[in-house]
UniProtKB/Swiss-Prot annotation:
Residues 331-422 form the ACT domain. The keyword Metal-binding does not apply. GO terms for cellular component: chloroplast; chloroplast stroma. Its EC number is 4.2.1.91, 4.2.1.51. This is Arogenate dehydratase 3. Its main location: plastid. The gene is ADT3. Keywords: Amino-acid biosynthesis, Aromatic amino acid biosynthesis, Chloroplast, Lyase, Phenylalanine biosynthesis, Plastid, Transit peptide.
Length: 434
């Protein structure tokens, strides 16, 4: 018997030896819906016998719900502990288990979800911890969003035969790999139109995962709505903030001077419209999302530039061994020390060795947000403190890269290699069918 205790929750789960069991699938709820599972007494008893899960007093909030077997982790509708806590806080603020404020301020009643059969992947749950796959088992890859998201397509491109695991937040995908729920995570890091995904840069520093690869995915946006809805009926458009930014000019050219509201992900916007029968709202998402959620495509290729590409990074618990027989890229993060022209000196370490930089991104140093002029001027900010993220074209197996980082370390108070990994050299061209 093996006991797994995730650090992010007080739930103690005991898993017995695996065996093939018969389980029920349940329809997933979105983040904005408070879910309650309802089983009849026969099903509840059968689930307890089949799964062999021992519920402890610390796991009362999972008692009588979906079991914690490996099959169930893909079928559950709960979320990781961070979201459970935030959901409880929302309930306390609202004064009880009444109506819950959902996306864009709409009210949604609590739902009792009955077990139904569905082939669609289900969100993760903290009760679904299971050991890493045995040798030869299918690779499990976490991505942010729901089925139909561009991140799901990127996961399929990076690992063609993987089992994609949807996560409701970027941080949940990081936690899924750290807790051995998933073997890899594929997350967006930058877009050719919308720029950097700052949230993921911050998470790369907070978590100890390693970048083991990258994949570039051409993004083809569509305007989706319920069947029968016309563009002139629309009063708002919802999607991920990056998607809204990537389609801003095109929406204006289409005469859609409507409210534009941000949600967690593109496919989630399509799912939200379908689930709530919103006939005055359109979503910006992929054509696959239209197929999955029964929406019509009002316009195709609405991104402002057909050469719209998102770069994703592949994350793992352990780094890969760098090589020199193919193009490699290395990602680092550092905080420069006090002194004049420090950033220039750091960048010169690469220039003197003919190492090309492909990206440099600055993010505020959270532990030291500002630097003061002197003790006599307390409260006067001289300048902000920053962390710098740099990508350069060289492998850590290359002596030039090793010497460059040795020199960089002389001028920095903090330096960390996020990963040294093969570059995505797959050729692509702008296409309306991407």
């Amino acid at each position: 018997m093996q006991s797994l205790t995730p650090s992010s929750s007080g739930i103690n789960i005991k898993l017995l030896n695996r065996k093939k069991i018969q389980t029920h699938r349940v329809t997933p709820s979105r983040v904005v819906i408070k879910c309650v599972y309802r089983f009849d007494s026969v099903n509840a008893g059968a689930a307890a016998v089949n799964t062999g899960v021992v519920n402890t007093p610390a796991s009362n909030n999972t008692a009588g719900h979906v079991g914690a077997s490996r099959t169930d982790w893909q079928s559950s509708c709960a979320i990781l502990a961070s979201k459970v806590v935030s959901q409880q806080q929302d309930t306390e603020k609202s004064g009880g288990a009444g109506n819950i404020t959902a996306v864009n301020g709409h009210k949604i009643l609590n739902l009792d979800l009955l077990p139904v059969e569905s082939n669609r992947a289900k969100p993760l749950t903290i009760t679904d911890l299971s050991p890493a796959p045995m040798h030869g088992a299918q690779l499990r890859v976490a991505y942010q969003g729901v089925p139909g998201a561009y991140s799901e397509a990127a996961a399929g491109k990076a690992y063609p035969k993987c089992e994609a695991i949807p996560c409701d937040q970027f941080e949940v995908a990081f936690q899924a790999v750290e807790l051995w729920i998933a073997d890899r995570a594929v997350l967006p890091i930058e877009n050719s139109l919308g720029g950097s995904i700052h949230r993921n840069y911050d998470l790369l520093l907070r978590h100890r995962l390693h970048i083991v690869g990258e994949v570039q995915l051409p993004v083809h946006h569509c305007l989706l709505a319920l069947p029968g809805v016309r563009k002139e009926y629309l009063t708002r458009v919802i999607s991920h903030p990056q998607a809204l930014a990537q389609c801003e000019l095109t929406l204006t050219k289409l005469g859609l001077n409507v409210a534009r509201e941000a949600v967690d992900d593109t496919a989630g916007a399509a799912e939200y419209i379908a689930a709530n029968n919103l006939r005055d709202t359109a979503a910006i998402a992929s054509s696959r999302a239209a197929e999955l959620y029964g929406l019509d495509i009002l316009e195709q290729g609405i991104q402002d530039d057909l050469s719209n590409v998102t770069r994703f990074v592949m994350l793992a618990r352990e780094p890969i061994i760098p090589r020199t027989d193919r193009p490699f890229k290395t990602s680092i993060v550092f905080a420069h020390d006090k002194g004049t022209s420090v950033l220039f000196k750091v960048l010169s370490a690469f220039a003197f060795r003919n190492i090309s930089l492909t990206k440099i991104e600055s993010r505020p140093h959270r532990n030291r947000p500002i630097r003061l002029v002197d003790d006599a001027n307390v409260g006067t900010a001289k300048h902000f403190e920053y962390m710098f993220y740099v990508d350069f074209e060289a492998s850590m197996a290359d002596v030039r890269a090793q010497n460059a980082l040795a020199e960089v370390q002389e001028f920095t108070s903090f330096l960390r290699v996020l990963g040294s990994y093969p570059m995505d050299m797959t050729p692509w061209s702008p296409s309306r069918d991407a």
